[in-house]
Amino acid sequence: MEENIFIEEQMNLSFNIMNDLRKRKELCDVVLCVGDLEIYAHKVVIASFSPYFYAMFTNDVVESRQNSITLKSMDSKSVELLIEFAYTARIRITEENVQYLLPVSCILQISPVKKACCDFLQSQLDPS
């Protein structure tokens, strides 16, 4: 007899621990430099949520061997929110950040956030 089980709490616990490690800058293997901001992360985590980072880290490009990656022409606060999303699956979309968050989520190919931004903008439309 065999049984496959899924314990969601374990997955949540694991990501909470990884996020805590990230916040303490422990066991991180990449630093994303966006403007004046340095965002510490784990390549495996950000590659798992972004096809952009997946391609960057799994192909034979210069960035795949670097520990520091400069992201140009991206809003630093949006990148920070998206990295937080990679670890928590939560993101706060506001009238103030949606105009910056949407283009960065498109560049990084983060479809759930892109859709959430579009839904947010659509909900803000006034038919009059």
What are these regions (language model features)?
Residues 1-6:
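Cytosolic, low-complexity regulatory segments enriched in Ser/Pro/Gly with interspersed Lys/Arg
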Residues 10-19, 23-128:
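Canonical BTB/POZ domain core
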